[in-house]
């Protein structure tokens, strides 16, 4: 039997009472987020936090079991406080919060992606390093009434990359290029519930149409995948054919494979993060065993227990 424990600090305060903590982390979204729900009252007195906590306060959430130790599940910043609905909710965002600063309007000509990212970091007054796996150059990139966050979001939408912050570094990589640790889940041991569907690749045919804007205003298209499958249209930041084809093949890989779609839910152990790999074992159906890239993890901590929902991406092996 494990004893649940937490250590949550916001600004100069340490929380002693909580109703629930919900943390969402994903390689497919720019920001990791957390929502801390506090009781509306303490010892029959309304809980007053708005005069103690403020937007921009540092947030560190550590959760776990006394017997196994606590893990830092989230680090970020307090974004806003809500007192609606009979309780107090603290909405938090990871270091992407620091990029929500206005950038000057500018039209950049022939700017390399890594240089663009370095410019975003600099204009937001930050000192993050940039680690970028892509080498393409934008013919033209327009910044108009945008924040650093808006620019990063546009880049992510156009290239389909994983963009995230880790160890004072802004990372941008193709999905699955940077892997974390391997986690093991056995349906008979540490999976509380699952929402999984097993598919064959031939049943999930996908045709990806990659579109890119040419200098003369026309749109260039490159098709990848299987004809007759579900058609998906995506944008590409560059208009050279190899880059467009690679972008399309990446999307096909994400969507078409023999394996599971969906998620599994376990407990706080093992610790699993987005970009980790998860190996699933089912003694009843060993042919379905496989290793998957983790795209998202939702962690919930309350009086009902600690749960971790792990969302599976493409199959690794």
Can you name each region flagged by the protein language model?
Residues 1-98:
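Assembly/oligomerization scaffold segments
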Residues 48-53, 133, 267-271, 301:
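Short, surface-exposed secondary-structure edge patches
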Residues 46-58, 102-109, 276-281:
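Extended Gly/Ser/Thr-rich low-complexity repeat segments
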Residues 84-190, 197:
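Charged- and aromatic-enriched interaction segments used to assemble
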Residues 20, 73-77, 89, 105, ...:
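Well-ordered beta-strand positions in beta-sheet-rich domains
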Residues 1-10, 153, 165-255, 261-304, ...:
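Acidic, small/polar-enriched beta strand-loop surface segments
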Residues 23-32, 81-86, 165-167, 255-258, ...:
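Short, ordered beta-strand-loop transition motifs
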């Amino acid at each position: 039997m494990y004893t649940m424990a937490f250590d949550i600090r916001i600004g100069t305060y340490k929380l002693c009472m909580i109703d629930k903590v919900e943390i969402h982390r994903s390689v497919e979204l720019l920001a990791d987020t957390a929502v801390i729900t506090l009781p509306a009252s303490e010892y029959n007195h309304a809980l007053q936090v708005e005069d103690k906590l403020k937007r921009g306060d540092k947030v560190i959430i550590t959760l776990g079991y006394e017997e196994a130790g606590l893990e830092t599940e989230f680090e970020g910043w307090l974004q806003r406080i809500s007192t609606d609905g009979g309780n107090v909710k603290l909405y938090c965002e990871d270091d992407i919060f620091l990029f929500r600063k206005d950038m000057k309007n500018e039209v950049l000509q022939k700017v390399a992606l890594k240089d663009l990212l370095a410019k975003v970091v600099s204009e937001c007054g930050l000192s993050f390093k940039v680690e970028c796996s892509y080498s393409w150059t934008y013919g033209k990139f327009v910044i108009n009434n945008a924040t650093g966050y808006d620019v990063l979001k546009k880049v992510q939408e156009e290239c389909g990359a994983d963009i995230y912050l880790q160890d004072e570094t802004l990372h941008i990589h193709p999905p699955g290029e940077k892997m974390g640790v391997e986690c093991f889940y056995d349906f008979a041991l540490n999976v509380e519930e699952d929402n999984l569907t097993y598919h064959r690749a031939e049943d999930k045919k996908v045709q990806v149409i990659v579109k890119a804007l040419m200098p003369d205003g026309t749109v260039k298209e490159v098709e990848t995948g299987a004809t007759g499958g579900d058609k998906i249209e995506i944008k590409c930041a560059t208009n050279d054919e190899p880059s467009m084809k690679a972008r399309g093949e990446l999307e096909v890989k994400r969507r078409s494979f023999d394996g599971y779609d969906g998620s599994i839910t376990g407990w706080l152990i093992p610790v699993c993060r987005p970009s980790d790999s998860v190996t699933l074992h089912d003694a009843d159906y060993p042919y379905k065993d496989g290793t998957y890239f983790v795209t998202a993890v939702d962690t919930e901590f309350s009086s009902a227990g600690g749960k971790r929902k792990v969302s599976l991406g493409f199959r690794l092996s």
